[in-house]
Amino acid sequence: NSQGGTIILGNKADVDNAVAAAKEAFKTYAKTTKEDRLKLLSNLLKITKERFEELAQAITTEMGAPITMSREAQADAGIGHLEGFIDALKNSKDREVLSSGDTILREPIGVCGLITPWNWPINQIALKVIPALAAGSTCVLKPSEYTPLSATLYAEMLHDAGFPKGAFNLLHGDGPTVGSAMSRHPDIQMMSFTGSTRAGTSVTKDSADTVKRVTLELGGKSPNLIFADCDLEERVSGSVLECFYNSGQSCDAPTRLLVERSCYEEVLKIAKRTAENQAVDEPTKEGEHLGPLFDKIQFDRVQNMIKVGLDEADLLVGGLGKPEGFEDGWYVKPTIFKDVSNDMRIAQEEIFGPVLVIIPFKNEKEAIEIANDTPYGLAAYLQTGDSEKAERVASQLRAGAVHINGGGFNYGSPFGGYKQSGNGREGGTLGLEDFQEIKTLHF
């Protein structure tokens, strides 16, 4: 929790200057060929691999992810998403003739405003900056003001890759000043935002007067359905660890464990044992342990929600305070509540920490009803040994992604949510298309 450095926050004048640079660069960058942009992306891939360790260390320093996790997931996203977008661009069609004889052109949308969060800094930067530039658009990036190190490093990498002056612009600043000025700016044609639902609503409102395109990736309270016919030991322990991953600071974390009553007691035993065995340690150490929460604000929020949980439900493991031996830093005990009802606050509100709630269900129909009883719809998870049931249940879950029996996210696949978890999709072909306009030629 010590200070790692200082940055200068921008203001509205800085936004105007950055947008002007992006607007001027768009005049020529939009005319580059797909081959030109593929070469630039290939250069960026080479540089990202060369500076990979720097990227991982920066993320660990600025947001506290354990260094092993920073390498295997946080920094790795900078490579994986880039490779996914390179494939998408290679396979994209700038020109397509319809059966009617009309021709569709896919063109860059223009100047894009990009706002990214602190919890997965390079993951989100890559999901926005790369498709914008791949499409021939130019952009202004405002990363979280709390994680400037990886963003600054990424700006250096883009410069070294050869992207032209003004195509990419990095502007540090806060949301109310810089973020709002970007959203309101008449020369920004698109805003892409990742963060809280509250902040995403503000971006949408600020963007309304200029009728710009807005894509949002927001919060989640993802359900994880445990059916009695799955491998309980493997799938329950894996589910608990997935909830705790990144210290629970992931918008798609499976934080609601919905359990079939016939195996409920066995699941409680496995979940408790898994949480008790989950190590917590310093982020600079190698290993599969959990690091601290991001900052005091986040720590206080999580502690407050644990207090709420103690009033609402029964504590299975964990609780208030810091783990023994970790009084210095924003460490939290991995915590699980049992016998939770889905109308409780701990089942409805995003906690953003290593806190899991366990909710029993009696049958498949009730499981689906509970799973969908949330304002969010970013992801869902289900564990079953019956493949037909898996497809049947997945088709009824209102979420942008369904992870079945531990199936993980693959680079190049679309990511995004239903309901108040946002709109638009990030990653691969669909993520590229969000940064394009469609023009129809009638002959």
Predicted regions and their residues:
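Conserved C-terminal structural/oligomerization subdomain of aldehyde/semialdehyde dehydrogenase
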Residues: 2-6, 188, 324, 328-443
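Short, structured beta/alpha segment
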Residues: 1-57, 61, 233
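Short acidic active-site motifs
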Residues: 14, 177-178, 366
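Rossmann-like NAD(P) dinucleotide-binding subdomain of oxidoreductase/dehydrogenase enzymes
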Residues: 94-234, 361
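Residue-level signal for inorganic ion chemistry
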Residues: 1, 37, 59, 82, ...
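ALDH superfamily catalytic-core signature
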Residues: 198-341, 404
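Long amphipathic alpha-helix in the N-terminal Rossmann-like dinucleotide-binding domain
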Residues: 42-53, 67-92
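Short, well-ordered beta-strand elements within core beta-sheets of diverse protein domains
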Residues: 3-10, 24-31, 78, 114, ...
